[in-house]
Every structure is written in structure tokens, then in C-alpha cells.
Amino acid sequence: MALFKKKTTLVHHITYMGIMAAINLIFILLATFVPPLMFILILLLPFASTVVAYYCLKRYYIIYAVATVGLCFLCSFNIGDTIFYVVPAIASGFVLGVLLEQKIHPFWMLLSCTVINAALTYAFIPLVNLISKTDIVLSLLTIFNLQDFLYKTELVYLFIFLISLAQCGLSIFIIISDAKKIGIQINTRINSFWPYIIGLEASIALSVGFALFYMPLALVFLCVSFYFAAFLLVDLIFSKKLLIYILSGVLVLAIIFVFAIFYKSLKEPYGIELSVIFPLAIGVVSFLKNILFKYPVNI
């Protein structure tokens, strides 16, 4: 049975899911004896789940999910960690596999899977704290020596979002790097940048809005705005339009000037929210570029 090939029979599906679950089990056992290896499992689990979701029929995925969760619990005897780390990774891996099958652009795949992974992790925090009788977030921050950080409460959601981004990003990177070898077609065609510009402006608006009453989510949406901005910046760099380069340079100088003047006038940690002007400027330039120049590209 070819490892990276669509499965056609029930036996193939069960065998394939068993192989992937066994690979997960190996990492689980290693992580049990060497706890730092748990992070390798956390990073690789979405990839294994994505491969299963892509090559197997979706109705059989629940078998793989239940088997993986069960093995994690039986080997670690920690239902809290299993719910907090493993379940979101399995769910986001399934979504990534479906999006791959639908030939969605990697940008949207990464964003969708990250949001789902992070949202499930957020949602499970109260349940995990209740089951384990410990503060799972504080335990996670302690691993990175951030337990005494002054603004740790404001950074918790952003921290989880970035971990989810790393998880899903690694899975997508591996898939894109070996796409031809494993028989997966990646869609990199972009016919319009307007959805990206709209997404950027929406994330900026949400970041500014939440900053008024709930800073943790404001920082998450600030991070999302930088995600959109980084993608649009690549397009601006490859536009090879002198007017765009000049406009970008002028805006960069203006942003640095504005940031330097107003940053200290804002109370910590709200000063960081002022960095929203960076993605905002990129959005403005991208907006003008897409009005003046229209062409489909591959990114």
C-alpha cells in the first residue's frame, strides 16, 4: 500500500490510520519519558492528521481521531493535556486536509487552521483547569519562563494563537515542500487581492475595537493584521512598480515618525497597539496598487 496515495477500500483506510496513529504513539511514548519532546508531538500532530484527512474518506476520520486521543490518554494518563494539546491539533488537521482537497490557497488554509486550533484551545481552558485542578495556561507559560511576566494576562491569547500558527504553519510547509512527491496539488494562483485587503482592514478594525475593552483579543487581531500585511507586502515587493516603491518608502518614514512620537504617550501595554499603523499603511498602498494595476499572480 503506497503511503501517500488515496485509499479505496475499508482495509486500506483502517491500515493507513493505524500506521499514522502508531507514529503518533511513538512520539507520545517518547514525550512521556522526555517531557520536552511533547512540543515535537504538538507540532507534528496536525501534519499526521492532515495526511489522514486528505488520503482517507472523511467518514472514517473519527476512527483515527478517537484512536489518537485514546492512545495519548492511555500513555500519558493526563486527560487535561490530551484535551488541551491533542484535540485542537486533530481538528485543525482535519480542516487542513479538507481545504487541501478543495485546492484552497495556502494563505487561507493556514489562517483557517490556526483560528480553529486556537479557538478550540481557548474554549478548552476552563474544562482542562477543572479536570486537572491546575492552571494549564500558567503551566504553559512556566515552560517558557513567562510566569512572572508583568503582562502575561494580556499575552495569553496571543501566545496560544502563535503556537497554533506554528503548528499549522509547519504542517503546510512540509506539505508544500514535498507536494509533488506525495501527489498533492497546491493552488498558488491569486486572481484578486481584494479579499486580502478586506481581511486586513477587518482585522485592524477588530484589533482597535477590542483594544477599548479587552486587550488580549486586540493583540490576537493585531497579529492577524500583520499576517495579512506580510502577505500583501510580498505582492508589493514583486510588483516592480516604481510608484509603489516610492509611496511605500514615504509611508515607512511617516510611520516611524508617528510611532516614535505617540508610543510613550500610551499606557503599557496599550502602546503596542499603535503598531497597527504598520499593517494599515501596507493596506493603503496595496489598495492603491490594485486600483492602478491589475494582474493575477502566484504567491
Label every model-predicted segment:
Residues L200-E201, L212-F231, K240:
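Small-residue-rich helix-loop
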Residues L29-M38, T68-G97:
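Interfacial aromatic-anchored transmembrane helix boundaries in multi-pass membrane proteins
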Residues A2-C56, Y60-Y64, P106:
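Hydrophobic transmembrane alpha-helices
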Residues I62-C72, W108-A118, L243-I255:
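Central hydrophobic cores of alpha-helical transmembrane segments
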Residues M109-A205, F210-A218:
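Membrane-embedded alpha-helical hairpins and interfacial helices in multi-pass inner-membrane proteins
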Residues H13-I26, A65-G70, P195-S207:
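Alpha-helical transmembrane segments
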Residues I23, Y227-I299:
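Long, positively charged, glycine-interspersed low-complexity recognition regions
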Residues G18-A21, V87-P126, S265:
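Short helix-perturbing small/polar motifs within transmembrane alpha-helices
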